[in-house]
């Protein structure tokens, strides 16, 4: 009898300690999954390509492939097997310690630039993401200055911006670590093409002083960056009608276009189909 009572007591304690899931608590009233059309979180997927994305795919990329064609290069041999994997200088000499020794590092500990590949239909350039960021100097004194900037970024991008905090203490700039100093938004997919189309077709043509991007823009890895003054923000159609309702002035911002191309010249050539470059850009075109 004692053994039976002990087993019953153990089973009762186990049932009391058993965790009850949310599904069991809600029962039939649990929320619908996001893929269910009756759910409040259901969002239908894209039914067509973005206009700018379709233009790049159908018109620009064939032109890029034709303009970058090189008849003196065999694309069949331009594979990873024929590229030089280890481009760091090796130790040369009769010293036995040179054998199996790690290669020498680049001077200044600079990283190696990616190997440029010949353009073919499989590695045509494309835009991976667009990062829009800004730093508000007035936010160092008054943090509420960032509220107007956050609302403006959310209006022109359609996404919730991310607050950027200072990493180091810089006394001449009155900068303290952990203080919010700016905001940024990372755009991908349809929102990225929508932002680029509005910027290139509606905003930049209204700037009388804008003649094009700098011919030297680029970080040698296929990324194009440029800055825009504070006069650009009120030109966006999302802000133009309600600009006077913003309590604080809106700053300028930086745009970083990240492409999958490893050649900066090819990246400039591709981005020039959206935003023009200034005259004298001899390296911006592939020839």
Swiss-Prot record:
Q: Give the record's subunit note.
A: Component of the mitochondrial large ribosomal subunit (mt-LSU). Mature yeast 74S mitochondrial ribosomes consist of a small (37S) and a large (54S) subunit. The 37S small subunit contains a 15S ribosomal RNA (15S mt-rRNA) and at least 32 different proteins. The 54S large subunit contains a 21S rRNA (21S mt-rRNA) and at least 45 different proteins. Unlike bacterial L5, uL5m does not bind zinc.
Mainly localized where?
A: mitochondrion
**SUPFAM superfamilies associated with the record:** RL5-like
**What's the protein here called?**
Large ribosomal subunit protein uL5m
> Its biological function?
Component of the mitochondrial ribosome (mitoribosome), a dedicated translation machinery responsible for the synthesis of mitochondrial genome-encoded proteins, including at least some of the essential transmembrane subunits of the mitochondrial respiratory chain. The mitoribosomes are attached to the mitochondrial inner membrane and translation products are cotranslationally integrated into the membrane.
Q: Which domain of life is it from?
A: Eukaryota
Q: Where's the transit peptide located?
A: 1-18
* InterPro entries reported in the protein's UniProt record: Ribosomal_uL5, Ribosomal_uL5_C, Ribosomal_uL5_dom_sf, Ribosomal_uL5_N
Does Cytoplasm appear among the keywords?
Answer: no
